[in-house]
Amino acid sequence: MQQPFNYPYPQIFWVDSSATSPWASPGSVFPCPASVPGRPGQRRPPPPPPPPPPPPTLLPSRPLPPLPPPSLKKKRDHNAGLCLLVMFFMVLVALVGLGLGMFQLFHLQKELTELRESASQRHTESSLEKQIGHPNLPSEKKELRKVAHLTGKPNSRSIPLEWEDTYGIALVSGVKYMKGSLVINDTGLYFVYSKVYFRGQYCNNQPLSHKVYTRNSRYPQDLVLMEGKMMNYCTTGQMWARSSYLGAVFNLTSADHLYVNVSELSLVNFEESKTFFGLYKL
């Protein structure tokens, strides 16, 4: 190949190493040198600018794969665990209740057995006492309460006043009643009381007296324990009614006799709730 000599630069041939030429063998073509020497005194032109980089190739965006669904096996295992825990607590509560019930039943059976043994023992002791004739131990005698409450006696027509000691609300215990008097059997402190109910169809304001006496062989005459007097107690010429009540504590001795006197027996109302006489030991 010829080239004109007046061309400032030699021609450059680019040969593809992969191509085959019918004119030359692959080994006879050599690559061009990287630079071509210039002539002396000639300015070398600047090298051509490098080619711009190819634009980046945008790959088509692909959608993200969907999240895998939650495992049904794990959910089932969790539910099964909760069910087992609940069943365990239910069984535990049932066992505790059963244990408490058994304990209460055992305790009740034990108490019942003890009661049966105690009753059997008492029955055996009683049977033995009856068989051998062993008397029971003497129990302490309860001291009788010294008390008396006498009520008015409608047919009383004498002084001292007579009283009812048996019927109605009357009672006598630990003392004696004899001919209108209460007889003391035991020395001590006693509360003595008496009430007399006076009434009349026509008032004349005559003085009324109500007295409680005690009589004892140690004294030459009877002693007045209590006394009540009434004067100007009603309106002249009209119906009237008044009560006289006496009560106090006395130290009485054995064999003392207590009785009641009034100044006007005919004006006394002998109803049991209105006229009475009594005492009790403190």
UniProtKB/Swiss-Prot annotation:
Q: Which residues are glycosylated?
A: 185, 251, 261
Q: Which GO terms describe its cellular component?
A: cytoplasmic vesicle lumen; extracellular space; lysosomal lumen; nucleus; plasma membrane
Tell me what PTMs the record reports for this protein. The soluble form derives from the membrane form by proteolytic processing. The membrane-bound form undergoes two successive intramembrane proteolytic cleavages. The first one is processed by ADAM10 producing an N-terminal fragment, which lacks the receptor-binding extracellular domain. This ADAM10-processed FasL (FasL APL) remnant form is still membrane anchored and further processed by SPPL2A that liberates the FasL intracellular domain (FasL ICD). FasL shedding by ADAM10 is a prerequisite for subsequent intramembrane cleavage by SPPL2A in T-cells.
Summarize the record's induction comment: By IL-18.
Keywords of this entry: Apoptosis, Cell membrane, Cytokine, Cytoplasmic vesicle, Disulfide bond, Glycoprotein, Lysosome, Membrane, Nucleus, Repressor, Secreted, Signal-anchor, Transcription, Transcription regulation, Transmembrane, Transmembrane helix, Ubl conjugation
Question: One GO molecular function term?
Answer: tumor necrosis factor receptor binding
UniProt cross-references to CDD domains, sorted A to Z: TNF (cd00184)
Residue ranges constituting the THD domain according to the UniProt record: 146-282
Q: Where is this region: Disordered?
A: 30-73, 119-140
According to its record, how does it sit in the membrane? Answer: Single-pass type II membrane protein
Q: Basic and acidic residues: which segments have biased composition?
A: 119-132
Under the heading InterPro entries, the entry gives: FASL (IPR028326), TNF (IPR006053), TNF_CS (IPR021184), TNF_dom (IPR006052), Tumour_necrosis_fac-like_dom (IPR008983)
Composition skew (Pro residues), residue ranges: 43-71
Q: SUPFAM superfamilies per the record?
A: Formin homology 2 domain (FH2 domain), TNF-like
* Annotated site residues (Cleavage) in this chain: 82-83, 130-131
TM region positions: 83-103
Question: What quaternary arrangement does the UniProt entry report?
Answer: Homotrimer. Interacts with ARHGAP9, BAIAP2L1, BTK, CACNB3, CACNB4, CRK, DLG2, DNMBP, DOCK4, EPS8L3, FGR, FYB1, FYN, HCK, ITK, ITSN2, KALRN, LYN, MACC1, MIA, MPP4, MYO15A, NCF1, NCK1, NCK2, NCKIPSD, OSTF1, PIK3R1, PSTPIP1, RIMBP3C, SAMSN1, SH3GL3, SH3PXD2B, SH3PXD2A, SH3RF2, SKAP2, SNX33, SNX9, SORBS3, SPTA1, SRC, SRGAP1, SRGAP2, SRGAP3, TEC, TJP3 and YES1.
Q: Can you tell me which family this protein belongs to?
A: Belongs to the tumor necrosis factor family.
Question: What function is annotated for this protein?
Answer: Cytokine that binds to TNFRSF6/FAS, a receptor that transduces the apoptotic signal into cells. Involved in cytotoxic T-cell-mediated apoptosis, natural killer cell-mediated apoptosis and in T-cell development. Initiates fratricidal/suicidal activation-induced cell death (AICD) in antigen-activated T-cells contributing to the termination of immune responses. TNFRSF6/FAS-mediated apoptosis also has a role in the induction of peripheral tolerance. Binds to TNFRSF6B/DcR3, a decoy receptor that blocks apoptosis.
What PANTHER family does the record tag this protein with?
TUMOR NECROSIS FACTOR FAMILY MEMBER (PTHR11471), TUMOR NECROSIS FACTOR LIGAND SUPERFAMILY MEMBER 6 (PTHR11471:SF33)
Q: What is this protein called?
A: Tumor necrosis factor ligand superfamily member 6
Q: Which organism is it from?
A: Sus scrofa (Pig)
